[in-house]
């Protein structure tokens, strides 16, 4: 327990509420929506979009195409040139941006139609059990792969080893607090 003496309130679990109960209440209150799409919890941020749904509550099902907010619309390959400065993405296809944020958004716009970076992550939840969540992260995956290629060409095997050890350790502590 992280904060002894604090009561944890879990109404969804305690009241055994189901998604259908939520939908029924919203309909009764006059809220109209595409309930097929509402089956999924979608959270978008700078580094990607997480997608949760009934399929992620199992250990063997993948998410269907329609669960992802960015549909696969492109199939003809394109080449993209990335420019880094001190490890940060600053340019895409020869255009240098004022901020890395703008460069990331530009790369995301190019990569998103290819449905790059889709997967299901399995990890430890805050309550100590394993959990699964789908995600799409086109620009981050390309940036990571770009960094990995640069590292292969510039670091020794022992530098790579220790960099990976430190990255895993740092990532866990950053995530876990």
Annotate each language-model stretch with its function.
Residues 1-177:
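Nucleotide-activated chemistry modules centered on ATP-dependent adenylation/adenylyltransferase
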């Amino acid at each position: 327990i992280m904060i002894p003496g604090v009561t944890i309130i879990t109404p969804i679990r305690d009241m055994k509420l189901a998604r259908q109960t939520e939908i029924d209440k919203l309909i009764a209150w006059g809220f109209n929506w595409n309930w097929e799409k509402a089956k999924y919890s979608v959270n978008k941020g700078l580094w990607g979009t997480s997608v949760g749904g009934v399929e992620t509550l199992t250990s063997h099902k993948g998410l269907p195409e329609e669960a992802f907010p960015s549909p696969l619309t492109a199939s003809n390959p394109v080449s993209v040139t990335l420019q880094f400065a001190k490890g940060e993405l600053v340019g895409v296809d020869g255009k240098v941006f004022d901020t890395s944020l703008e460069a990331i958004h530009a790369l995301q716009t190019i990569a998103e139609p290819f449905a790059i970076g889709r997967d299901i992550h399995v990890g430890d939840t805050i309550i100590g059990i394993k959990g699964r969540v789908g995600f799409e992260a086109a620009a981050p995956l390309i940036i990571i792969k770009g960094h990995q290629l640069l590292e292969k060409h510039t670091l020794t095997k022992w530098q790579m080893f220790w960099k990976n050890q430190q990255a895993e350790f740092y990532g866990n502590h950053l995530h876990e607090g």
